[in-house]
Amino acid sequence: MKILGVDSSGLAASAAVLSGDTVVAVFTVNNKKTHSQTLLPMIKEVVDFSGIPLEELDAIAVAAGPGSFTGLRIGSSTVKGLGLVLDKPIIPVPTLEGLAYQLAESDGFICPIMDARRNQVYTGVYEMREGQMVEVMDQCAMDIHDLLKAVSYTHLTLPTNREV
């Protein structure tokens, strides 16, 4: 399956093309420009670099949140437009689950965190069971200090998308 993936949920924006389990091309931008300025040019570059034409894609995936409200709107509206024009299905991917999958080979619980501002983080707890990512604690926004008190440090990995 060939998929274009787009994430504009945080300060950085990313676009990637996957063919099966292989990341063919990836492009990440973390500069002062807004996602509305960078997302379409990034998508064009990553698709061109991958050598897989947009028409050959099987689906388009988009980070579905939590995250920056404006960034999520820009990403979802961009992907929705592409999906309509190309007649491709759209796959919403929970942002925290996407972060957790980066550590799918880890033992124990995975607790991704994203800065939600004002000493808050977006978080959830996941665990790999029989090759499947399982949500152990629902995604939520909470005080970073409450999270640190609540989690056990045994077999816990904390992937983040930036410093908190």
Which residues are covered by each model-predicted region?
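Residue-level signal for well-ordered, solvent-exposed loop/turn and beta-edge residues enriched
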Residues: T22, S68, G131-Q132
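Residues at secondary-structure transition points
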Residues: N30-T38, F69, R73, S77, ...
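DPxDG-like acidic metal-binding loop motif
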Residues: A61-P92
